[in-house]
């Protein structure tokens, strides 16, 4: 009991302020979807939402795409959804069902059956064709689902609690959370040519977050008309530059899934891979990538115990791959992250992480490398290293910059390659240990 109280106090410390800042009061939502969330009995407190459904109501089959964890212990829902995407090639996937509080990972044959049953029951209740639903789970690894609770909860949710109001979307976003301190929901309208479309997305994640996705679930939906093959390529590009460019603690989970559904309810010309669609394709790719970055950054801002949001910006690398590898190396350094928590301008830890990044010869030349702190308020940056030469650091100015919640660290490799990448991370605090030390209690 005391562990639960302590964990609650740690989470509550962050919840009120972050929720007020990052949970939207209103939203704009795409045509032809209904969503919702309820408590069905996965979580033990008897009231916290733990079951979510999204459903395409447009009347025409949607296109779908998904990217999944690279962890070798893929959870049952990941395997089931991966198989569905492969078999359907993304055509005719019209719903998503998610439970939180239990990952259904490393649960053997029973876990596979449970994930498949979630698909079957959801399809039946929503009057979908068979195999039209993606399934996701998140929570504690190694325990079987309370599947009877979930299977009885699906009809209750699907028949009585789905809609397209802002509250429906908030309920859906809340129902997929675990240690998150606020639901993560973003929506916007955009135009391609003369057509106006809407994009909405939600995700969960606060710990076990690192590239190639972690305990991270999310989905984007749009009313734009997009072919499955085009949507898959766009999603992969966007995720690589968003959810695969964040880290909280360097741990990769068994359950990661990011999915996208496009139902075409807003009309307009189909966006596919034909050369005639190149301009519309590029515009949609940019919109979804920018959108994915917004959502991914919310995950970092809600990092377990985090007090800082840090952007690692690498410039003038030989390739995008090099830039991302170097940014990732710094972002995942525990020594760097603890220094940021302690407001310590120990830039040697940044250089150390740059130096062991997995890049080729010539990718990092110490004599050409520069590093600086860039305040987000627009005030003057603080140069730490210039072309391999250390600068005399104004410790008082460094403390002022590091006292802010947001910080940009700019690394200029000076290679002449002109390539760059951004990576987002947070600090590593005492609270992170407290939260994860008590996670199962």
From Swiss-Prot:
Listed GO molecular functions? glutamate N-acetyltransferase activity; L-glutamate N-acetyltransferase activity
Q: In which pathway does it act?
A: Amino-acid biosynthesis; L-arginine biosynthesis; L-ornithine and N-acetyl-L-glutamate from L-glutamate and N(2)-acetyl-L-ornithine (cyclic): step 1/1; Amino-acid biosynthesis; L-arginine biosynthesis; N(2)-acetyl-L-ornithine from L-glutamate: step 1/4
Q: Which InterPro entries match?
A: Arg_biosynth_ArgJ (IPR002813), ArgJ-like_dom_sf (IPR016117), ArgJ_beta_C (IPR042195)
GO cellular component assignments: mitochondrial matrix
Q: Which residues form the active site?
A: 215 (nucleophile)
Query: Where along the sequence does the record put site: Involved in the stabilization of negative charge on the oxyanion by the formation of the oxyanion hole?
Result: 138-139
Which residues hold substrate?
178, 204, 215, 304, 436, 441
According to its UniProt record, where is this protein located? Answer: Mitochondrion matrix
Q: How is it modified after translation?
A: The alpha and beta chains are autoproteolytically processed from a single precursor protein within the mitochondrion.
Look up the EC number in the record and give it. 2.3.1.35, 2.3.1.1
Q: Which CDD domains match?
A: OAT
**A GO biological-process term:** ornithine biosynthetic process
Is the Zinc keyword given for this protein?
A: no
Recorded catalytic reaction(s): these are:
N(2)-acetyl-L-ornithine + L-glutamate = N-acetyl-L-glutamate + L-ornithine; L-glutamate + acetyl-CoA = N-acetyl-L-glutamate + CoA + H(+)
List the residue(s) that the UniProt entry marks as the site Cleavage.
214-215
Matching Pfam families: ArgJ
Q: What does the record's miscellaneous section state?
A: This protein may be expected to contain an N-terminal transit peptide but none has been predicted.
Q: What does it do?
A: Catalyzes two activities which are involved in the cyclic version of arginine biosynthesis: the synthesis of acetylglutamate from glutamate and acetyl-CoA, and of ornithine by transacetylation between acetylornithine and glutamate.
**HAMAP family the record matches:** ArgJ
Subunit composition?
Heterodimer of an alpha and a beta chain.
Family, per entry: Belongs to the ArgJ family.
NCBIfam families membership = ArgJ (TIGR00120), PRK05388.1 (NF003802)
PANTHER family, sorted: ARGININE BIOSYNTHESIS BIFUNCTIONAL PROTEIN ARGJ, ARGININE BIOSYNTHESIS BIFUNCTIONAL PROTEIN ARGJ, MITOCHONDRIAL
Could you identify this protein by its name? Arginine biosynthesis bifunctional protein ArgJ, mitochondrial
The organism is Lodderomyces elongisporus (strain ATCC 11503 / CBS 2605 / JCM 1781 / NBRC 1676 / NRRL YB-4239) (Yeast)
